[in-house]
């Protein structure tokens, strides 16, 4: 009886430990990215929304702007995410 109790307790703790993993990002809908001339500037999000000319239907949840280095110095890369799942 004692071994069955320990086994059940062990299974419960393993379930909790495996389902409480931090650092995993759940997919948040559609993602689109594109390279553009120029730098991100002080407000990269507005720059990316303007550059990508996103329609209002896209409902941008977040845009990330990253200045590029190396061969593409003087360019920036925009990645925008929508809040719509299943695109």
Swiss-Prot record:
Tell me where it resides.
Answer: Secreted
Q: Which domain of life is it from?
A: Eukaryota
- Gene Ontology CC annotation, any one: extracellular region
Q: Which cysteines are joined by disulfide bonds?
A: 30-87, 40-65, 48-78, 63-80
Q: Where is the signal peptide?
A: 1-23
Which keywords has UniProt assigned to this entry?
A: Antimicrobial, Disulfide bond, Fungicide, Plant defense, Secreted, Signal
Q: Give the primary localization class.
A: secreted
GO terms for biological process? Answer: defense response to fungus; killing of cells of another organism; signal transduction
Which InterPro entries does the record match to this protein? SCRL
Mind telling me which Pfam families this protein's record contains?
SCRL
Q: Which family does it belong to?
A: Belongs to the DEFL family.
What protein name applies here? Putative defensin-like protein 238
Identify the taxonomic lineage of the organism of origin: Eukaryota, Viridiplantae, Streptophyta, Embryophyta, Tracheophyta
Report the gene name. Answer: SCRL16
């Amino acid at each position: 009886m004692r071994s069955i109790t320990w086994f059940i307790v062990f299974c419960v703790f393993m379930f909790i430990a495996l389902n409480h993993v931090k650092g995993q990002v759940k997919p948040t809908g559609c993602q689109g990215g594109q390279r553009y001339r120029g730098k991100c500037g002080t407000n990269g999000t507005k720059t990316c929304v303007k550059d990508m000319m996103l329609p209002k239907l896209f409902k941008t949840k977040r845009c990330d702007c990253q200045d590029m280095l190396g061969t593409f110095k003087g360019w920036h890369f925009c990645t925008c995410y929508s809040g719509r799942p299943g695109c």
